[in-house]
Amino acid sequence: MADLSLDFCGVKFKNPVVVASLETTNSPEVIRECVDAGAGGMIIKTLTDIEDMARLTQNSKYAILNEKNELIRGKVNKNFVFYSRSGYSSTPLREWIPHLKDLNKYAQDQGSHLIGSAGGKTVQSWIDICRTIEDCGLPMVELNFGCPHPAMMPGVHGGSMIGQEPDIAREVTARVCEAVKIPVVIKLTPDQSRVLDVARAVKEAGAAGVTATNRYTGFSVDIETGLPRLGGPAGIGGVWAKALSLRWVNRIYTELGMPITGSNGIYDHKDVVEFIMTGAPLVQVGSVLMLKGIKYLPSIINGLDSFMDIHGYPDIASMTGIASRQAVKDYGEQFRKPRMHSEITSEACKNPSCTICIQTCFYDALAQGDGSVESIHANCIGCEMCTQTCPFDATAMHTTTDEQRALQEFFMIKEEVFENKKFEKGFERGIKLAKVKG
C-alpha cells in the first residue's frame, strides 16, 4: 500500500487531499464531517473583518452549468462550470474563536489539520486575524489574495486586488510573516498575467508556499432571456480550468521551486495526480464537494491510493513534479525532437469513405486512395490531429528518419552524403552536412 502522507511547509499531512476554503468549511458541523470523511486537512472559509464580504456569503448565488451552458439540474458531469458569487465566512471571527481550538483538536486526533484562512480590511487586521488563528493552535494560515469578488465590492480592497499587485502582496505577506510563527501560504489569483511575479514577491517576503490558484472572474449569459446569469460578473471555476491552473503550478515549481498547493480543477483522483505530477504535492478540493456532498471525498482519496499502487509509486514525493521536470523549457525544444509522420492501418479503417481524417488534415498529408486513405509523408508535419479525429483508431504516428526528414527539407542532396551514413549523429548535424555538400 502506498504511503499517502507528506510534509508540507513543516506540517505533516496524512494524505494530500485538503478541503478548500468555501461553504464546506463555513460551519463547525461540516468541518467535523470533513474530518470523519478522511480529509488530510480543511481550510476554514476565510475569516474576515470586512462586513460586506461576510454579507455577500449570506446572499450567495450559484449557477452550475453543463457542457450545453444549461443548469445541471442534478446531473453533475466532470466538465461542469461552477459560476457563483460568494464572500468570506458569514460567521464573525469572535464567534469562531471558541470553535477553532476544539475543531483543531478534533482534526488532529484523527491525523488531520484545520488550517486558517485570512482576508483583512487593513494590514493590521490581516495581522490580527492571523495571530488569532495561531493563538487557537492552528498549524498554518492561508492569506486569501485570490478571491475575485472584492473587485466588484465598492469600498472593499482585498482578495485578488491585493494578489494582482506584487508590491502590495509583498508588504502584506512580510508584515504577517513577521507577526506569526506558523507557516504562511498565499492563495494566488489567476486574474492577471503577473502570477509568477506575485509568487516571487511573496516568497521573498517570507511566505512558506503558495496556492495555485483561486478562481477567475467570469461573465455568463442566459441566451433564452438575454440576461446575465446571477445579474453580472461572478467567480468561475471547475475542471475545465485545470490546465490553466497547472500552467502556473508548472511555472512556479520550475522557476521558483517553492511549495505549492494545487487548486481550481479537481473532480476526481486523476485530477489530483495531475496536480501532484506537475508540482503541487498538496491539493485543495472544493466545488465538486459542494455538488456531490462530503461523502464523495473518500472516493478521491481511495482512488489516489489505488492509482499509486497500480502504477508503483511508493509515496507522494515519488510523483511530485515528474511531469514538469520532463516538460520542454521553451517551444524551441519542440523543433529539436524527432519528426513524426502518420500511417494509416487499412485493416483498422472500417469506413475509408468517412474521410474525417482527410477533412481535418490541413497540410494535404492524407488523401483518398483506391478503397483506402493514403498518407503522404512528404506533406505530414506530425501534428497528430488525425490520430484524434479518426473514430476507428486507424492512424498512428511513426518517427521520420533523419534521411527522410532531410529529403523533405532539401530536395537536392547529393547521394554520397547518405552513402557514408553521415546522418547517424542526428538530424541537426545531418542538415549541416547536407547544406555543405548539397
Task: Locate the predicted segments by residue.
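Extended, hydrophobic interaction surfaces within ordered domains
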Residues: 250-256, 271-327, 381, 385-388
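Short linker/helix segments within small regulatory modules
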Residues: 369-377
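C-terminal helical cap(s) of enzyme catalytic domains, especially alpha/beta-barrels
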Residues: 51-71, 219-237, 288-313, 407-414
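N-terminal capping/small domains of soluble enzymes
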Residues: 1-127
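C-terminal accessory/binding modules appended to enzymatic or scaffolding proteins
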Residues: 338-370
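Alpha/beta enzyme core
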Residues: 32-37, 41, 109-110, 121-261, ...
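Short secondary-structure boundary segments
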Residues: 45-47, 145, 214, 287-288
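Flanking helices and flexible, charged tails adjoining ferredoxin-like Fe-S electron-transfer domains
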Residues: 304-314, 318-334, 346-347, 351, ...
